[in-house]
Curated annotation (Swiss-Prot):
The active site is at 200 (proton donor/acceptor). This is Carbonic anhydrase 9. It comes from Homo sapiens (Human). PROSITE patterns: ALPHA_CA_1, ALPHA_CA_2. The chain crosses the membrane at residues 415-435. SUPFAM superfamilies: Carbonic anhydrase. The gene is CA9. Induction: By hypoxia. Substrate binds at residues 332-333. Asn-346 bears high-mannose type glycan structures. The lineage of its organism: Eukaryota, Metazoa, Chordata, Craniata, Vertebrata. Forms oligomers linked by disulfide bonds.
C-alpha cells in the first residue's frame, strides 16, 4: 500500500525538545515505533457454505462484521427471490461432496467453469432441438423463478455478495491501484471461438494465453466473457451507480494463476477476478460488438452454439484501463462463491440503439421465453469499502462527472505507523541539530583570549 506523502509543514509545527530531554525522548520513540504493519487482510468468507462447490470458505472473522451504514438493498428485479431465514439454510452436512475431476485434462476448458457468472443450462424442455451435447450436471436455477437461489447454493445468502450499488462519493481513493495490464487479448481470426446461448446469457469461450494483471503478484488468465441486459425500455446492468442502472453490462471472467482449476479457486479470496464495463446507447455502431451481435440469430434457441472468428477482446472494453472501482464480492449467479475481485470500469462502452435491441430481443431462454432481464438485484455492502483508482466521479454520458471525497485506502495500522515515523524523523533532526549546537559551543569554549602585549621601546 502506497503511503501518503508527509506534509512539508509538519516539522515546523512540532517544537524541538529541550536539550535535557532529547536522549530520553529518542529512546522512548525507538521503543514505540512499530515495524510498518502489513495491510489488513481482505474479508474472509462469512461461512463455510460460501464456497459454492468447493465448500472450503474461510469463516467470518470479527473484523468482517458489517457496519451500521450499509447500502440499502433495492427492490428485487426478476432475478432474485427473497432470501430465506437462517433456519431455511441447509447445514454443512447437506452440502454435496466435491468429486475430483480427471487429472488427464491438460488445459482449462469451459467445463472447468460450470457456473461462473454464466453457468450451464437449467432444465430444458424435451423438445429443445439444441440441447447441450456435453450435458449439464449442475443445479437448475433461473432468473425470477423457483427455486430460490440460496436453496440452489447456500453461498447465495452470504454477506459479501455481488453486484452492488457504487457510490463514488463514498469510494476510497487508493493511489496504489495502478492501470490494468492486458496481454494477448488481440486474437487472430483462427482458431475460431465458441459462442453459446446457455439459457442465462450469451457466452464466448476464450482460448489460453489471455493474461491480465491487477498489480504485482496478482496475475490472472481470462476464461470467458458474457453479457447481462434488460428489455425494451428497461435497463439491465448488474452493478449500478448511485442507483442508476445502465442498459447492459459485460463481464470478462479470469482465474488466478495461483490455481490450476476453477473449482480450486471458488470461494478463495482473489481466486477469481471479473472485469466489468457498462454498455449504453451511443450514436454509432460499435464494430467490435457487431462481430458477436451479428451472430446471435444463429444461437437464438437455448443451448445452441456457433463458431465465430477470433477478435480483439480488449476492443469490447473501455479504452481507459486506469480509472476503475474495485471491491471484493461474489459471483452474480449460483454458486455465488465469494472472494471474487471485481473491477468495474469508470468509462462506459457505446453501442447503437439497434445493437442494444438486438442483444435484448434475439435470444430465447428456458420455457420458450425471451432471454431478457438476466441481472441480479444489487446486494448490501455489509461494511465493505469500494476503492477507486482515481479521485473523480463516473464519466458516463449523459451523467456528468461528480467529485468524490478523497477517502484514504490506508488501513489504521498504516496511518499509525506513518505518524510514528514522522515523529521519529522530526525528533532525529532535532537531536542532530542540538548535538551540532553543543559541539560548536564546546569548540568556542576551548579558545583562550589574551590581551595583546605592547612592547615599549625607547625613543
Amino acid at each position: 500500500m502506497a503511503p501518503l506523502c508527509p506534509s512539508p509543514w509538519l516539522p515546523l509545527l512540532i517544537p524541538a525538545p529541550a536539550p535535557g530531554l532529547t536522549v530520553q525522548l529518542l529512546l522512548s520513540l525507538l521503543l514505540l515505533v512499530p515495524v510498518h504493519p502489513q495491510r489488513l487482510p481482505r474479508m474472509q468468507e462469512d461461512s463455510p457454505l460460501g464456497g459454492g462447490s468447493s465448500g472450503e470458505d474461510d469463516p467470518l472473522g470479527e473484523e468482517d462484521l458489517p457496519s451500521e451504514e450499509d447500502s440499502p438493498r433495492e427492490e428485487d428485479p426478476p432475478g432474485e427471490e427473497d432470501l430465506p431465514g437462517e433456519e431455511d439454510l441447509p447445514g454443512e452436512e447437506d452440502l454435496p461432496e466435491v468429486k475430483p475431476k480427471s487429472e488427464e485434462e491438460g488445459s482449462l476448458k469451459l467445463e472447468d467453469l460450470p457456473t461462473v457468472e454464466a453457468p450451464g443450462d437449467p432444465q430444458e424442455p424435451q423438445n429443445n432441438a439444441h440441447r447441450d451435447k456435453e450435458g449439464d450436471d449442475q443445479s437448475h436455477w433461473r432468473y425470477g423463478g423457483d427455486p430460490p437461489w440460496p436453496r440452489v447454493s447456500p453461498a447465495c445468502a452470504g454477506r459479501f455478495q455481488s453486484p452492488v450499488d457504487i457510490r463514488p462519493q463514498l469510494a476510497a481513493f487508493c493511489p496504489a491501484l495502478r492501470p490494468l495490464e492486458l496481454l494477448g487479448f488481440q486474437l487472430p481470426p483462427l482458431p475460431e471461438l465458441r459462442l453459446r446461448n446457455n439459457g442465462h446469457s450469451v457466452q464466448l469461450t476464450l482460448p489460453p494465453g489471455l493474461e491480465m494483471a491487477l498489480g504485482p503478484g496478482r496475475e490472472y488468465r481470462a476464461l470467458q466473457l458474457h453479457l447481462h441486459w434488460g428489455a425494451a425500455g428497461r435497463p439491465g446492468s448488474e452493478h449500478t451507480v448511485e442507483g442508476h442502472r445502465f442498459p447492459a453490462e459485460i463481464h470478462v471472467v479470469h482465474l488466478s494463476t495461483a490455481f490450476a482449476r476453477v473449482d480450486e479457486a471458488l470461494g478463495r479470496p482473489g481466486g477469481l477476478a471479473v472485469l466489468a464495463a457498462f454498455l449504453e446507447e451511443g450514436p454509432e455502431e460499435n464494430s467490435a460488438y457487431e462481430q458477436l451481435l451479428s451472430r446471435l440469430e444463429e444461437i437464438a434457441e437455448e443451448g445452441s452454439e456457433t463458431q465465430v472468428p477470433g477478435l480483439d477482446i480488449s476492443a469490447l472494453l473501455p479504452s481507459d484501463f486506469s480509472r476503475y472501482f474495485q471491491y471484493e464480492g461474489s459471483l452474480t449467479t449460483p454458486p455465488c462463491a465469494q472472494g471474487v475481485i471485481w473491477t468495474v470500469f469508470n468509462q462506459t462502452v457505446m453501442l447503437s440503439a439497434k445493437q442494444l435491441h438486438t442483444l435484448s430481443d434475439t435470444l430465447w431462454g428456458p420455457g420458450d421465453s425471451r432471454l431478457q432481464l438476466n441481472f441480479r438485484a444489487t446486494q448490501p455492502l455489509n461494511g465493505r469499502v469500494i476503492e477507486a483508482s482515481f479521485p473523480a466521479g463516473v464519466d458516463s454520458s449523459p451523467r456528468a462527472a461528480e467529485p468524490v471525497q478523497l477517502n484514504s485506502c490506508l488501513a489504521a495500522g498504516d496511518i499509525l505507523a506513518l505518524v510514528f515515523g514522522l515523529l521519529f524523523a522530526v525528533t532525529s533532526v532535532a537531536f542532530l541539530v542540538q548535538m551540532r549546537r553543543q559541539h560548536r559551543r564546546g569548540t568556542k569554549g576551548g579558545v583562550s583570549y589574551r590581551p595583546a602585549e605592547v612592547a615599549e621601546t625607547g625613543a
